[in-house]
A protein has these predicted regions:
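Active-site pocket-shaping loop/turn-to-helix segments
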Residues: 18, 63-82, 119, 123-130, ...
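Condensing-enzyme catalytic core mediating Claisen C-C bond formation in acyl metabolism
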Residues: 7-11, 31-40, 203-274, 283, ...
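Glycine-/small-residue-rich "gating" segment that lines the acyl/pantetheine channel
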Residues: 31, 39, 121-124, 160-163, ...
Length: 795
């Protein structure tokens, strides 16, 4: 049986979608087989072959207090969150670092992106656009002060968010996590799926007609709580959250593997980590999109795993009622699965006529796909599955029993064993070290990285170069470099033991902006089938998986610039908990024309070159991709890997302020540093060097300096300060990752010295930092909205 410290329980539910504005309304309509699919009137449908959508009908959405400046997707998320908190008898958390927010999304603020191009590009739309804004705004609304991030793995995002919530609780990093997902119906996904000919002109018919999807919108929120915390406050408990599985197909950016390998890996890992038998699972809320490739692969996966193992399995897809809600789908379907479990009723899959039922009987075997009408069924354990663009797969299990989850947090030390470095001043570790030796610095206020086909050709990937967007090119090259630098070859034998955690501030927003500008000009019927797959934030991580053959954990996190360091914290947790042996943790952002434009609207790009501590009103906008290879000590030792540094501990905290600002969020950095030191079992006196995030913008630089003064006091006079943005500008998530990569290269002696800073009596002075004097380095990163990550590494 699961130990109490590993038990995660659900204590609150929130839901809004096309068949209801709260959990009870949605559930009652689901049991009555009500569909919310109708003709849409909210997007341009001229010359479009499909005009259906499952849209939310909640007239008071724009009346939720203090949400006037938020995108529709964030309003949907806050609506579901508030219901879940009320259900759990919880409210505002006073900034507690024990309360976290993890939200999934696919297209983020796509409604605001559309509005931007249709209304003369107002600056007020910019901070509503990124996926980053969602969880950050929820955290501000409920005053959560713990780990705050968004999972951007397209249609698997909502499921992975709940899985990560449990990982944080089992790691001792949180007592309560508000987890879920949200997406709004908008012209970008509508036009994109039209371009792929993936929409059905009729209501979608999962596991049946399989002629396309119908898009939906909404949000699902789940309050995940440690069992002991819930017990202490005498909370109502819906169910236990047992194990989960997250995998990558390494196959195709939009289509699943026909053999279902990746799906089956995720499902089997969820079962194994739950400690349940296959025949204990009574109901599965399937991904079931209504496309032939997806449904056929899922059919195969379910039959392969459960035939001859479970003769009492029921499966349904609720997408026939609520549509495909993209990043919200996994969260919405998790709520449906939990309601099925707790009410002993299973919702139907709609759309079968008599002839369809004959065909279903031929291919369903002993699996009951619950056609057309819901049914009563005694349930003890249920599963929810989500599969996504990029080849991402996620499965999670809920139960009335505690299961046998055996997560540990002590699977050995975690080492840095390799790097891939792509910056505006060249690509590769050796190039970067040479640039540091020559003290290379930015020479303009906006700079960008580039990748050429020959760099792909070195790794046998030249044919794929032109298929990848700019962001993906940066990520794929740095990822392939990192594997080479770490001397790791991906094989069929080790592919599932290697994972990817991509961190990004803005992700694919640049491509999304380009895609939207085109359809605003030419109409939704003329979206680009070539560009659309690259509008999802996890495309870069998906392409990296495809090019390298990595089939393990694959997740994209996004919450501002600190995402590049947050990815290292997430990856460290994955290795500590024994989910993978090796994880590529990345920080990647691009500076294409569209991105430069929207940052210009915010007036944060300096008029000239801006370097740390120059007290300017802007920064040098930059980009790049940094991949850091993390590995457990046992496997690193076994293969004789070079160890650049050891990850001792990490901390993540939030002092939430309106997204797009940092002013007033100082406490968040203080708390992140304290948590990192505690996790590393070190004191302030053990830290000799800090690798910071100063960029030249005075507001940001002052937060960093003032926090150091509060945390370190007089001992600050003895500490060195590395600022990588001296060399690469404000590269956002790439700079956050680089802060750790640079420090690790100094700890290993690969970088002998660097021009850095000293803080003496409150004043910043320049100095030369010798690597031979370094032992313990504190790396820190910030995000607009007030989230901070701190990580301690050592020799």
């Amino acid at each position: 049986m699961t130990n109490n410290n590993n038990r995660c329980v659900v204590t609150g539910l929130g839901l809004i979608n096309a068949i209801g504005n709260n959990v009870n309304e949605c559930w009652n309509n689901a049991l009555n087989s009500v569909t919310g699919i109708k003709n849409t009137t909210t997007v341009d449908t001229k010359d479009c072959y499909a005009t259906l959508a499952a849209e939310v009908n909640y007239k008071d959405l724009d009346s939720i207090p203090n949400t006037a400046n938020l995108d529709r997707v964030t309003k949907l998320c806050i609506k579901a969150t508030l219901e879940a908190l009320d259900d759990a008898k919880l409210s505002s958390f006073g900034g507690s670092t024990r309360v976290s927010v993890i939200m999934g999304s696919c297209v983020g603020g796509a409604v605001s992106i559309d509005h931007y191009y249709r209304n003369d590009k107002p600056a007020s739309d910019v901070c509503k656009m990124p996926i980053s804004a969602i969880a950050s705004s929820v955290a501000e609304y409920v005053k959560a002060g713990g780990v705050v991030t968004n999972i951007a793995n397209a249609c698997a995002a909502g499921t992975i968010s709940i899985a990560y919530a449990c990982d944080l609780i089992r790691a001792g990093k949180a007592d309560i996590v508000i987890a879920g997902g949200a997406d709004a119906f908008a012209s970008v996904p509508y036009s994109g799926f039209l371009a792929l000919h993936a929409l059905d002109s009729n209501p979608c018919s999962p596991f049946n007609k399989c002629s396309g999807i119908t898009l939906g919108e909404g949000s699902g929120a789940v309050i995940v709580e440690s069992y002991e915390h819930a017990l202490k406050r005498n909370a109502k408990v819906y169910c236990e959250v047992l194990g989960s599985g997250v995998s990558s197909d390494a196959h195709h950016i939009t289509a699943p593997r026909e053999d279902g390998e990746g799906q089956m890996n995720a499902i089997n890992w969820a079962i194994k980590t739950s400690g349940v038998a296959k025949n204990e699972i009574g109901y599965i809320n399937a991904h079931g999109t209504g496309t032939a490739k997806n449904d056929n692969a899922e059919f195969l996966s379910l039959h392969t795993i459960f035939d001859n193992e479970n003769d009492n399995l029921s499966v349904s897809s609720t997408k026939a009622m609520v549509g495909h809600c993209l990043g919200a789908a996994g969260a919405i379907e998790a709520v449906f699965a939990i309601k099925a479990l707790t009410t002993n009723k299973v919702p139907a899959t709609l759309g079968y006529d008599n002839d369809d039922l004959v065909r279903l009987a031929e291919k369903a075997g002993k699996i009951d796909f619950i056609p057309n009408k819901s049914k009563d069924k005694e349930l003890n354990t249920v599963m929810s599955n989500s599969f996504a663009f990029g080849g991402n797969n996620a499965s999670i299990i809920f139960s009335k029993e505690a299961g046998d989850v055996k997560t540990t947090n002590d699977n050995g030390k975690v080492y840095v064993t390799g790097f891939g470095i792509v910056t505006p001043f060249g690509n590769g570790v050796d190039t970067y070290i040479n640039n540091i030796n020559n003290n290379v610095k930015p020479e303009s206020n906006s700079i960008h990285s580039s990748v050429v086909a020959d760099e792909y050709a070195k790794y046998g990937q030249k044919p794929t170069y032109r298929k990848h967007d700019n962001l993906s090119q940066l990520q794929v090259l740095s990822g392939m470099q990192a594997l080479e630098n770490a001397n790791i070859t991906v094989t069929d034998e080790n592919a599932t033991t290697i994972g990817i955690v991509e961190g990004t501030a803005d992700g694919a927003m640049g491509t999304c902006l380009q895609f939207t500008e085109n359809i605003v000009e030419k109409g939704c019927a003329n979206g680009s089938a070539f560009k659309f797959p690259n509008t999802v934030y996890n495309a870069a991580g998906g392409y990296l998986s495809i090019c390298t053959g990595i089939k393990g954990y694959n997740v994209t996190v996004t919450n501002g610039s600190q995402s590049g360091l947050q990815s290292v914290a997430y990856a460290t947790n994955i290795i500590r908990q024994g989910k993978e042996k090796v994880v590529l943790a990345t920080g990647t952002d691009e500076n294409i024309e569209a991105i430069n434009e929207v940052y210009g609207k915010l007036n944060v790009i300096s008029n000239d070159v801006a370097l740390p501590f120059e007290g300017k009103n802007g920064f040098t906008l930059s980009d790049g991709s940094i991949t850091i290879v993390l590995e457990n000590d046992k496997d690193a030792n076994a293969r004789g890997a070079k160890k650049y540094a050891e990850v001792l501990g990490y901390g993540m905290a939030t002092s939430a302020v309106p997204f797009g600002t940092v002013k007033g969020s100082d406490k968040g950095l203080d708390e992140a540093i304290k948590l990192a030191l505690a996790d590393a079992n070190l004191t302030i006196d053990d830290i000799d060097t800090i690798s910071g995030f100063a960029c030249g913008l005075k507001t940001i630089d002052d937060i960093e300096l003032n926090s150091y003064k509060r945390i370190f006091g007089d001992s600050l006079n003895n500490k060195n300060l590395i600022e990588v943005k001296d060399h690469v500008g404000e590269a956002r998530a790439a700079a956050a990752s680089l802060s750790l990569a640079h420090a690790a290269l100094m700890l290993s002696g690969d970088i002998k010295s660097d021009n850095g800073y000293k803080l003496s009596n409150g004043n910043v002075t320049k100095t030369v930092i010798e690597s031979k004097n370094l032992k313990n380095v504190l790396c820190v990163a910030y995000a607009a909205g007030g989230t901070y990550t701190a990580i301690v590494i050592t020799k």
